[in-house]
Every structure is written in structure tokens, then in C-alpha cells.
Amino acid sequence: MTRPDNVLHWKDVTDLDDSGYPGDDERLGFTAKLSSKLGLFRLGIGHEVLPPGRRTSYPHAELSEEEFVFVLEGTPDLWQDGHLHRLAPGDSVGWPSGTGVAHTIINNTDTDVRLLIVGEPSRRRFKVHYPLHPER
């Protein structure tokens, strides 16, 4: 029996592009942009795999977007406003818009980390501040 079009597995849609930010050699995680692949445009849902030594992004703070992360597997570090906090499977973290709380998730372990990331889909009105990379 064929699966319906609105059912997919994250491994089938993960972007294996090993690039990072333009002009930077740092490699980030691999993301499956689930919402867009399923035709959902009001939600931004992604499954991210962080190999050892990688992070989700530059530390950043959303000015007008909400963001949520749920740890599926592994024990990554939450970097938040310059402090590290160890996370575990089942932990969730939320950032309401406009708080100015800078954050990223880092894999400082020797095994892969898997995250479910939910936010509002990118729109031109959304502004992001990168405190350690203000030129972005």
C-alpha cells in the first residue's frame, strides 16, 4: 500500500548540504524542513540532526518571532546569553518574541543530537539579531 502524500519520514527530506553561513567555514546541523515539504506554510517545523561539534546557528535573538525546541535524542548544550545549560531528551525550550534572549543549541558530545524545532515561518517582517555577528 502506498503512503499518502501527507506522510513523510524526516530522513527522506533532510538537506544534506554541508554548508554554513556565507563566508564562514563552520558547518551547522542537517535540517529536514518538514512543514514546507508537507505544504504547511503557517508553521515552521524542522527536524535537525547535529553531529558532534556542530550547532544549530549563530547565537541569535528573534525580535518578532516565537521559537521552540524539543530534544528528541542526545544531550546538547543550550547556549543562552553566554551561559551553557545541558539539555536531555524530553527537554523543551521556548523563546517568546521580543525578549532579546540570544540562543543556539550546541552538540558538545561525541554522538548525534536530534531536535524538533518549531517557529513561525520566515517572513520579511521578522528581524533577527546576532549579538556575536552584528553584521548579519
Feature roles, as predicted:
Residues 82-98:
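Short acidic-glycine-tyrosine-enriched beta hairpin
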Residues 47-51, 61-80, 118-121:
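Short, conserved beta-strand element in jelly-roll/cupin
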Residues 58, 78-79, 95, 102-108:
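Short beta-strand His + acidic residue motifs that chelate non-heme Fe in jelly-roll/DSBH
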Residues 51-55, 75, 84, 99, ...:
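Short, charged/polar surface micro-motifs in flexible loops or helix N-caps
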Residues 106-136:
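Double-stranded beta-helix
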Residues 28-33, 46-62, 100:
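Conserved short histidine dyad/triad with adjacent acidic residue
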Residues 1-42, 127-136:
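A short, N-terminal "cap"/entry segment at the start of jelly-roll beta-barrel domains
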